[in-house]
């Protein structure tokens, strides 16, 4: 789950 400019690997799948 892409959040702003970070890579969210917890909720999403690390896609940026």
UniProtKB/Swiss-Prot annotation:
It catalyses: a 1,2-diacyl-sn-glycero-3-phosphocholine + H2O = a 1-acyl-sn-glycero-3-phosphocholine + a fatty acid + H(+). GO terms for biological process: lipid catabolic process. The keyword Amino-acid biosynthesis does not apply. It is found in: Secreted. Its main location: secreted. GO terms for molecular function: phospholipase A2 activity. The keyword Transferase does not apply. PLA2 catalyzes the calcium-dependent hydrolysis of the 2-acyl groups in 3-sn-phosphoglycerides. This is Phospholipase A2 1. It comes from Opisthacanthus cayaporum (South American scorpion).
